[in-house]
Amino acid sequence: MSLSPAIFSIGPVSIHWYSLAYVLGIVFAYWHLHKLDEQKIFTKNFYDSLLTATIIGIILGGRLGFVLIYDPISYINNPIEILKTWKGGMSFHGGAIGVLCAVIISCRRYNIPIFYTLDLISCGVPIGLFLGRIGNFVNGELFGRVTTMPWGMVFPESGDNLLRHPSQLYEAFFEGLLFFAIANSLFFLTRIRLYHGTLTGIAVIWYGTVRFVVEFFREPDYQVGYLWLDLTMGQLLSIFMTLLGIIVYLSALNSKFNTKSVA
């Protein structure tokens, strides 16, 4: 399976599918956030602040997370490569921390409930994850392990001619499309949204669990390989995420972050 990572090129400038995926994901999340703000507590200034901070958080957090967690030595030896985000190499876990920092900063600045905001963001982010994984698929990166399944694909970036799981598509569906449907169904069809933090907790639990399982079908990052108990770095980070999500969810149900909270 070989697709061009560039949509088109004009001279030395190329527009890449991976970059477009990020842009479309952010635009959709921004629009969806506005749609879900039933209490209409978000002001234009807050939206602008959150959008700017989120873009910075995604890029810095995602890129630095990848560099520091997965391949620090390589980038220390060739630091200019850190800037080449269009080649891929973005860490979801690092990006998530960046977005969390962006939300906290913007909410504190405009006195907006943090977990109310995170709950709404959790309903729109899955589409961004879907688009991002499609970008990974087009780039031919983050491919799966060798398989005999009939839907196995050959990824040139793997350096061999073996059929592999299209693990990017697994993640695109389960982390993206399926959870988008689940999160928005919970938001619109139940009263769970009244307990600020519940949707955030569910989102973190869902991602951590799905990522942990999909990692069994995904080729480990060559820079890190297998770690403790033959688990990958992605799985170890996902275990931490799942535990954190459970804590947030249970705390929300106990009304620690309920509708009476302001931050």
Curated annotation (Swiss-Prot):
It is a multi-pass membrane protein. It is an enzyme of class 2 (transferase). Pathway: Protein modification; lipoprotein biosynthesis (diacylglyceryl transfer). Its EC number is 2.5.1.145. The chain crosses the membrane at residues 7-27, 50-70, 85-105, 112-132, 169-189, 197-217, 233-253. InterPro entries: Lgt. PROSITE patterns: LGT (PS01311). It holds the Pfam family LGT. Belongs to the Lgt family. This is Phosphatidylglycerol--prolipoprotein diacylglyceryl transferase. It comes from Wolbachia sp. subsp. Brugia malayi (strain TRS). The lineage of its organism: Bacteria, Pseudomonadati, Pseudomonadota, Alphaproteobacteria, Rickettsiales. The gene is lgt.
